[in-house]
Design a protein with these regions (language model features):
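A short, well-structured edge-of-sheet supersecondary motif
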Residues: 21-59
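Active-site-proximal alpha-helical segments within enzyme catalytic domains
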Residues: 74, 78, 202-220
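Active-site-adjacent helix/loop patches that line small-molecule binding or acyl-intermediate pockets
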Residues: 2-28, 80-198
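Active-site SXXK
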Residues: 54, 67-86, 211
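Generic alpha-helical structural context detector
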Residues: 128, 176, 210-213, 239
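Short alpha-helical patches at coil-to-helix transitions and adjacent helical residues
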Residues: 10, 68-74, 119-123, 168-171, ...
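A penicillin-recognizing enzyme superfamily signal
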Residues: 201, 221-242
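A short acidic/small-residue loop/turn micro-motif
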Residues: 63-65
Length: 242
């Protein structure tokens, strides 16, 4: 997480965040509907915090990589806002869904306009928007994530992406329904391929914490074309990516 607490220190991390959160680490289970995720060790626990004062605190397996799945939707939204501005909201809403993140029923009732960018339907529409704008979307998306996190070793996990493609029937249904309501411009298989790659991108807690610093330090706005590893240097109108 990117935080702005002047008094934050390693002792606070250990005594508050770790003690409060670690007991919940054994609750729940992996997403077994994606075979490649079902076999991940569930006993790993890591935490990393970067402050906007350039302090870093880590605990446990903070540098262990994992596929970020729906966290990728934040990066997609930042890119789409940079490219589309307020026009984005003509295709995706801003409201809580009130239903499951992968609901087909709500999407049908609302004629193919997803409630928000963070449910699967909204993320799939954003994927379509990126395909419309970017000449080399997979490469440009990865370049953005590498740039904002300052780690050029970040990569797509092809095994996870393939596992999702082979078992992503509900996401395929969502994409077909979006296409039916004319809210998808590109080929369905092309959209799904890129969407599953985004979800598969592999980062660590350290990488993610670093990547979200520009969002925490929102006085310095940015676009996907203007990121450097050093937080003070961003370029864009502030309203774009807040």
């Amino acid at each position: 997480a990117g935080v702005g607490l002047d008094v934050f220190d390693g002792e606070m991390l250990e005594n508050f965040f770790v003690k409060e959160i670690q007991p919940y680490a054994s609750i729940g289970k992996q997403a077994d509907y994606i075979p490649a995720l079902a076999k991940i060790n569930p006993d790993q626990f890591g935490m990393c915090i970067h402050t906007i004062q350039n302090k870093t605190f880590m605990h446990g397996e903070a540098t262990t990589g994992f596929s970020i799945q729906s966290i990728s939707k934040v990066f997609s939204l930042a890119m789409c806002l940079s490219l589309e501005g307020d026009n984005l909201w003509k295709r995706v809403g801003k409201e809580p869904s009130g239903t499951a993140f992968n609901s087909l029923v709500q999407l049908e009732v609302e004629k193919g306009i997803p409630r928000n960018p963070f449910i699967n339907a909204g993320a799939i529409v954003m994927t379509d928007i990126l395909l419309n704008h970017l000449k080399h979307p997979e490469e440009e998306y990865l370049r953005f994530v590498r740039s904002i996190s300052g780690n050029n070793q970040i990569h797509y996990n092809e095994e996870v992406a393939l596992s999702e493609r082979e078992n992503g029937y509900l996401n395929a249904a969502i994409t077909n329904l979006l296409k039916y309501y004319h809210n998808i411009d590109n080929d369905i298989e092309r959209v799904l391929h890129f969407y599953f790659l985004q979800c598969s991108i592999e980062m660590s807690c350290y990488d993610l914490s670093k990547a979200f610093l520009p969002f925490a330090n929102h006085k310095q706005a940015f676009t996907f074309e203007g990121i450097t590893p050093e937080p003070p240097r961003f370029s864009a109108a502030p309203r774009r990516c807040r």
